[in-house]
């Protein structure tokens, strides 16, 4: 392999078509670097199960390689080599651990087989701590380095039981210990890493960290207001421009769908609440049992939108955007909302305030907080909403543009 090319193996995302933070990040990183001959990305994707990669739904895929059974095992996207990892489906939460271990094993085998010089293995999330010393030593023996993106308190996520949370916390400590550098997407996350793990690195060292945020676009969608694709989508979903509040994100408890739906139902708003997500039936039914939201015709689960220009236009035309994430660092969905939607209503936790500052309105999980904010927001005049939008876009352009973020990664990856 050409020693002048920096090979970077990206570990931890499920696919390139999902709404998770890492999926969005990898999509944009490979897009912005696709014509940089100094970099070659290798992206792991799930072959099966929840959130798996379906390359037929993503435009621009080439070089598809299939196995003897006709299943895609490898393809090219944004000039990145994407490879699929199959996972046993009957091992429950252990799937996440199995997935990362299987990816790292495949990465090490590939690096060895193709004699890749000075590879970087960039691991997103802290799931495989007990295996990290083994892989750290293996990758170093192959002449590589281990980079980590600590995902922002995986152990705090509501979906996990107490024993699993305990495992994630211990795993996080080991992951931070056995990495060459931790790239933190939030100043709050970087501070947390040092507060918790200074003096706990190899031979009692402090972890080496840098801050590089996620990015977002500030341009307008290429679709016009009367584009047939947009109008057809609106007709199909029963929505109209500026006639809906919006949320886009993974359908998991810690994103506070329960609070947002309950509070919207309490509000007096005449607008709809459009929810773009990959619905999990178990969680959906649990919410219905608690909230009986199906009786409120304003609440609309509208499925997924893989067309990025259409999704951007849907964001632009939303009256307001809700963001209920309370675990994690800089969230791509929030950045995209600030870059596209004028009025943003955010859960007032540190991570969200760090990103949006005074370019958004904030709510708490207290009863009536969001409902009251929705009713106030419905009464805002156009001038106030436009001013909020301009402020939000300025914030993104100054600190979170994808061009700026991708340039920072080039500097880091190519630093010798």
Which stretches of residues belong to each language-model region?
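Glycosyltransferase donor-sugar binding loop
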Residues: 45-50, 216-217, 248, 271-288, ...
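Conserved donor-binding/catalytic core segment of Leloir-type glycosyltransferases
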Residues: 8-11, 229, 234-255, 261-268, ...
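Acidic donor-binding loop of glycosyltransferase active sites
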Residues: 313-329, 342-343
């Amino acid at each position: 392999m050409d020693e002048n090319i920096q090979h970077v193996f990206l570990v931890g995302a499920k696919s390139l078509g999902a709404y998770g933070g890492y999926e969005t990040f990898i999509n944009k990183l490979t897009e912005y670097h696709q014509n940089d001959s100094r970099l070659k990305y290798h992206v792991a994707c799930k072959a099966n199960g929840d959130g798996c990669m379906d390359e037929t739904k993503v435009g621009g895929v080439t070089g598809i390689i299939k196995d003897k059974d006709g299943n895609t095992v490898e393809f090219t996207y944004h000039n990145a080599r994407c490879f699929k990892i199959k996972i046993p489906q009957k091992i429950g939460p252990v799937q996440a651990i199995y997935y990362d271990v299987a990816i790292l094993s495949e990465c090490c085998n590939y690096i060895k087989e193709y004699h890749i010089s000075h590879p970087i293995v960039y691991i997103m999330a802290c799931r495989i701590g007990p295996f990290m010393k083994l892989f750290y030593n293996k990758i170093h023996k192959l002449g590589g380095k281990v980079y980590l993106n600590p995902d922002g308190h995986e152990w705090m996520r509501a979906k996990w039981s107490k024993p699993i949370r305990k495992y994630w916390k211990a795993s996080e400590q080991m992951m931070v210990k056995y990495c060459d550098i931790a790239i933190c997407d939030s100043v709050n996350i970087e501070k947390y890493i040092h507060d918790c793990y200074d003096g706990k690195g190899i031979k009692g060292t402090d972890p080496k960290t840098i801050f590089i945020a996620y990015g977002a676009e500030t341009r307008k969608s290429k679709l016009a207001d009367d584009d047939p694709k947009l109008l057809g989508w609106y007709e199909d979903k029963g929505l109209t421009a500026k006639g809906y509040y919006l949320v886009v994100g993974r359908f998991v408890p810690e994103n506070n769908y329960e609070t947002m739906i309950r509070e919207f139902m309490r509000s007096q708003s005449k607008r709809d609440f459009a929810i773009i997500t990959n619905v999990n039936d178990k969680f959906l039914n649990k919410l219905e049992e608690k909230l009986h939201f199906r009786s409120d015709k304003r609440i609309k689960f509208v499925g997924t939108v893989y067309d990025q220009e259409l999704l951007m236009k849907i964001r632009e035309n939303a009256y307001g955007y809700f963001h209920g994430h309370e675990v994690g660092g800089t969230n791509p969905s929030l950045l995209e909302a600030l870059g596209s939607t004028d009025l943003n209503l955010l859960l007032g936790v540190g991570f969200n305030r760090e990103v949006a500052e005074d370019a958004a309105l904030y709510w708490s999980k207290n009863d009536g907080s969001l409902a009251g904010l929705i009713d106030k927001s419905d009464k805002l005049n156009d001038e106030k909403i436009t001013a909020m939008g301009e402020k939000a876009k300025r914030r993104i352009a100054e600190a979170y543009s994808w061009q700026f973020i991708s340039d920072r990664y080039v500097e880091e990856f190519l630093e010798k």
